[in-house]
Swiss-Prot record:
Catalytic activity: D-erythrose 4-phosphate + phosphoenolpyruvate + H2O = 7-phospho-2-dehydro-3-deoxy-D-arabino-heptonate + phosphate
The keyword Transferase is assigned to this record: yes
Xref: InterPro entries: Aldolase_TIM (IPR013785), DAHP1/KDSA (IPR006218), DAHP_synth_1 (IPR006219)
UniProt-listed NCBIfam families: aroFGH, PRK12755.1
Gene source species: Candida albicans (Yeast)
Designated name of the protein: Phospho-2-dehydro-3-deoxyheptonate aldolase, phenylalanine-inhibited
Length: 368
């Protein structure tokens, strides 16, 4: 129930005169009780976390590979396809489904399934959280999933379902998000959930490895001061940028040297800590270039590179992207099935081809 602020627009008020009102938020523990983890989900999540950490720490020689979701049914369809691929390549690839439900925005636009689940500007966030948790419980009955952390509150509703967490490119320089990464943890065991940090230099990654204190909420929804231990299982993603692409061997080597210089990689922690984003700047924002990026990285892996822990691919059932039609033209009901409404993605057939290339690269590296 939305509680309207009767003083909105009244500049004589000391506070909240720009606030239209409030909608009470469902407490995290209530939502977790409503959609609890199943034994199957718990097993897959923990195994995914442990495997990801083993890869980062050099104990597992596979590669790890994690677009925003707007259609839960299509997400389940995609998950089933990805599960079949993961079974095929499980000896070489740890496949983690990228299940991002919130979309960080540089300006404005649809902010994701949690923020606006009906894709019509109604912002039924409580509904979005319920859809999100129900969907994640279903997805994790098949595969481990990766999620992006945009604030310090939503993880309390969903983080127990993630095997890999991400702090996005727009937020790695934010002190609050570094603090969040330092305490991003498993609710199921004592192992820290691996965290992705997207940018160079490596200051955010070093900061996340240290203890911090920050404001958040508890499971019952009470505001609290959170103290963290620090996260030793962080890794960096190379996504390209204003200076060009950075998936080539020279860029990877320079990043590895920075990781060693920053003591993120040491003799005691020699595992690979570099993931390559095949999309965004590395694809020059053309999704059709993602397989080309993957091929170049696969060649590095096949040649014996041990600093690359994985790749990130923006993939969907069908390729490309689409805009949400105006309401008078059907709105979200007129959307094409399995096509992204945010970043453009490669389709399923191309995804299968890329996974095959990566799996073969791992096999070649093992034979060296």
């Amino acid at each position: 129930m939305f509680i309207t602020n009767e003083h909105v627009g009244d500049r004589s008020r000391m506070e909240d005169w720009r606030i239209r009102g409030y909608d009470p938020l469902t407490p995290p523990d209530l939502l977790q009780h409503e959609y609890p983890l199943t034994p199957e989900s718990q097993k897959i999540i923990v195994e995914g976390r442990n495997a990801a950490c083993d890869i980062l720490n050099g104990k597992d020689r596979r590669l790890i590979g994690p677009c925003s979701i707007h259609d839960p049914q299509a997400a389940l369809d995609y998950c089933e396809r990805l599960y079949q691929a993961s079974e095929k390549h499980k000896g070489e690839l740890l496949i983690v489904m990228r299940a991002y439900l919130e979309k960080p925005r540089t300006t404005v636009g649809w902010k994701g399934l949690i923020n606006d689940p009906d894709i019509d500007g109604t912002f039924h966030i409580n509904k979005g959280l319920r859809i999100a948790r129900k969907l994640f419980v279903q997805l994790t009955s098949k595969l481990p999933i990766a999620g992006e952390m945009l604030d310090t509150i939503s993880p309390q509703f969903l983080s127990d379902l993630f095997s890999v967490g991400a702090i996005g490119a727009r937020t790695t320089e934010s002190q609050l998000h570094r603090e969040l990464a330092s305490g991003y943890h498993s609710q199921l065991d004592s192992k820290t959930v691996p965290m992705v940090l997207w940018v160079l230099p490596l200051t955010p990654l070093r900061a996340a490895s240290h203890p911090h204190h920050f404001l958040s909420v508890t499971k019952p929804g009470v505001v609290a001061i959170v103290g963290t231990d620090g996260n030793q299982d962080c890794f960096v993603i190379l996504r390209g940028g204003k200076k060009g692409t950075n998936y080539d061997a020279k860029s990877v080597q320079e990043t590895q040297e920075e990781l060693i210089k920053s003591k993120v990689v040491t003799e005691m922690k020699p595992g690979p800590r570099i993931m390559v984003d095949c999309s965004h700047g590395n694809s020059n924002k053309d999704h059709r270039n993602q397989p080309k990026v993957a091929q170049v990285v696969a060649e590095q892996v096949a040649g014996g590179d041990k600093s690359i822990c994985g790749l990130m691919i923006e993939s969907n059932i069908n390729d490309g992207r689409q805009d949400v039609p105006p309401k008078e033209q059907g709105g979200k009901d007129a959307l094409k099935y399995g096509v992204s409404i945010t970043d453009a993605c490669i389709g399923w057939e191309t995804t299968e081809e890329v996974l095959e290339v990566l799996a073969n690269a791992v096999k070649t590296r093992r034979s060296l």
